[in-house]
Amino acid sequence: MKTSRNYPVYKVNKHAEGLLVGGHPWVYENDIQSSPEAEPENGTLVDVVSTKGAYLGTGFLSLKSKIRVRLISRNANDTFDAAFWKRRVEYAWAYRKTVLEPADLTACRVIFGEADQFPGLTVDRFSNILVTQTLSVGMEKLKPILFPLLAEVLRADGQTIEGIYERNDEALRAKEGLAQNKGWFDLPGETHPDSTQTEICENGVFYHVDFENGQKTGFFLDQKYNRRAVARIAAGHTVLDCFTHTGSFALNAAKGGAARVTAADISAEAIAMAQRNAQRNNLTNMDFLCEDTFELLPRLEKEGHPYDFIILDPPAFTKARRTVENAMRGYKEINYRAMKLLPRGGYLATASCSHFATEELFIKMLHAAAKDAHRQLRQIEVRQQAPDHPILWGVPETNYLKFFLFQVI
């Protein structure tokens, strides 16, 4: 192996070599054939080579994780200085400016981990605030260099960035040996805002975002264009939005001209936020229910409520392979109940945000639910996550969101 650097070398087996050559950036602990005699420092850069010594890439070492190395480059001559990382940020931002509409750039995902070659890092923009989540030790160590560059690159493009807030209260950090925490990142020579709340506008709908306490980084940006698709179908219909969270699909449906929208969620806190968002947008064609969807749908069917468009956007029912079977039963139950509740000719929007609930499994589940409900599905659209959450071929973990629009006949 010939490189211009002198990093510790990890040799991997044929299985890992095949994955890496195919574009995947991870090296698992079990796929390492040999490693340096003196164990390198956690989070340091290491080179990865094949069984024959051919260079495969350079990445961050994680001694606590089963994912032992996360590649950041496949160029043996790269120099990983501040200029390198600045180019990476510029490249990611240029991509967003290309694939998103200008109005969407103030509420978008700026960095999507491995898909942007920042393994384990998420950066979301909410108006003038960047909210980050760091899930790898390599990115954690890089923060003093990388985070100021994030602000620098966006500001150089004329974007107003007032601060960077860290949402590292994620249990996955423990797998990297990292503590959970959240708070403002101290940009050199700057003070941060006092408030941890802001407002964004997406598809012409305003949302209050609590990026300190909201789920994940504060708001789910990946469904932005799917919400727009729902708004188009909703016009003139009576809509039930299950798992509404802070009301995003319901608000788009209401603004899109729905006759009436009911937004339902098991969380009273989420319903309160959805009501606040409805008031902010002056939407009066909305009702709100604090109820478990698994109980709500059978009750509404029994009572004969006249909804002709139902939206199912549940949280991930599975985050591991071992629970996929149970998750698919849950997905089938809510989809079956929705199909039974809808009149023939009604509409169904249904989604899954779990990578492990693959599109193949999801389609199979929908077929089974329709069969049991004695309904047939007329497909309108199959959609996915918004393009600021890019799907990197060879990395199936980046392809996680399934979204289907049907007419139920």
Identify the function of each model-found stretch:
Residues 333, 347-409:
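C-terminal catalytic and target-recognition region of SAM-dependent MTase-like enzymes
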Residues 236-245:
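Conserved class I S-adenosyl-L-methionine
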Residues 1-127:
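Non-catalytic accessory regions of SAM-dependent methyltransferases
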Residues 111-124, 143-219:
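Non-catalytic substrate-recognition/targeting regions of SAM-dependent transferases
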Residues 269-311:
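S-adenosyl-L-methionine
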Residues 307-337:
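Mobile active-site "lid"/loop adjacent to the S-adenosyl-L-methionine
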Residues 260-265:
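Conserved SAM-binding motif I beta-strand of class I
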Residues 246-259:
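Conserved SAM-binding loop of SAM-dependent methyltransferases across substrates and taxa
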